Amino acid sequence: MSLSKLSQKCFSRHHARTFIRFSSSDFQSLLGPPRVPNPYADSGRNKFAAPIVPINVNNHGNVFASIKVPINETPEAVAFKPEVEEAPRVEKVEVEATKIETEKVASSPAPATPPSAIDELNSLKDSLSKLEEAAASKTSAPSGSSGDNNDQPGNAEEVEARRKRMERNTRIGGYVLLGGSVIGFISFCFYYGRAQRDEAGNVIADEFSGSFLAPFYRIANSFKLWKDYVVEPAREQLLPDPLPAPYLQPKYTIVIELKNILVHPEWTYKTGYRFLKRPALDYFLDVIGYPNFEVVIYSSESMMTAAPVVDSFDQKQRIMYKLFRDCTKYMNGHHVKDLSKLNRDLSKVIYIDFDAKSGQLNPENMLRVPEWRGNMDDTSLVDLAELLKTIHLSDAEDVRPMLQYYSQYDDPAKEFRRRAVYLAQQEEQKKQQPDDSSMLKRYSGRLFGFRRHASA
């Protein structure tokens, strides 16, 4: 066999196998059979290829004739050859081959029709329903209320034994928890209710000694002390006694909040957390600082936060005392300043703040001013300094009536400036009235001949 024949035979085998493979039922669509009829299902419509086969006729050499062979007959295909003129004998061979192949195609069974998509979906639905029923039966079986398995005596006894075992474990756990709680309570009372002892180990007598319930009284007193530590100020006397002679003790005490009155906290991505100093703060401290007033910073901020801020802007030491959050009274979630613990005469104490809740224990001593939010064009401290200077110059024995009067306005410093301008205008008018009257008298005297009386 020549090389050309071998290559043609391999090529035909490859195409025949490919057609048979993709014509099988395994490659049918899941959506069902095609609506267009398959031309290869009808044996009468089979098309035949015409491979060329060499035939020896009357010893005249190789004569090529075309023999029609069904495409789907066998996996092997016949090699194709160029067509030549047909001989009468070739026609007989062709007719016989056609009859044989027609009989084979007619006797071969028709390909099975693949199931449709609706049938597959119905079967899938049936299988899912069966799985759901099986899962439901497994779930309801342990409950003991229904199911065929629970009707058996062995399963019922097992369920009852499990219930009794769980009940016993629950009872034992409750007893252990109750016993641990009792032991813990007794240990707590014994530790915190014991009497204090000195360095030698002797018992220190207190007001609860000799009582059968002394440990409980001591525990209640410990809770009270802890509450006072959190709620009440750190000490009963927040400021030391006034300066004795020959030192100069200012007559009036100014208690002022730090946050949003003198400085404003601000946080940015670039600078982080910092405090802005209010405009004219240095002038304000120069006016009200020692020896004019006894200035006390009383802030709700912690000492670690507020103390460095105060030291940064008070380099001249014009502020005498600093009180922080530990010196406030915690009431209803708010830090309240108790001025009665300042160890000063409240008739001469001026408390400046923007929050009315901070001075709710002593509202008559409070001068409420607007909150400063970092506006650098603000000049309220200048007006407030003039107001406090006026109070100092008035030398009043009780400043509370003046504070109550100005506290009725939203901005006391602004109202004071308005009244100061008004009084200055009134004084200017009073100064001008005597001059006008004297000029009128001199003019009228000259007019009516009374000059000699004026000269006399």
Curated annotation (Swiss-Prot):
Membrane spanning stretches: 172-192
Annotated Polar residues bias: 137-153
Membrane topology term: Single-pass membrane protein
Protein name per UniProt: Mitochondrial import inner membrane translocase subunit TIM50
Transit peptide as recorded in UniProt: 1-22
Keywords of this entry: Membrane, Mitochondrion, Mitochondrion inner membrane, Protein transport, Transit peptide, Translocation, Transmembrane, Transmembrane helix, Transport
Quaternary structure and interacting proteins, as annotated: Component of the TIM23 complex at least composed of tim-23, tim-17 and tim-50.
Mitochondrial intermembrane side: 193-456
Topological domain ranges for the Mitochondrial matrix compartment: 23-171
GO BP field: protein import into mitochondrial matrix
PANTHER family: DULLARD PROTEIN PHOSPHATASE
A Pfam family it matches: NIF
Protein task: Essential component of the TIM23 complex, a complex that mediates the translocation of transit peptide-containing proteins across the mitochondrial inner membrane.
SMART domains, A to Z: CPDc
Compartments (UniProt record): Mitochondrion inner membrane
Coiled coil: none
Organism of derivation: Caenorhabditis briggsae
Family affiliation: Belongs to the TIM50 family.
Disulfide pairings: none
Segments of this protein annotated with the region Disordered: 101-120, 132-165
Span of domain FCP1 homology: 247-391
Domain of life: Eukaryota
Key word Membrane present: yes
GO cellular component, one term: TIM23 mitochondrial import inner membrane translocase complex
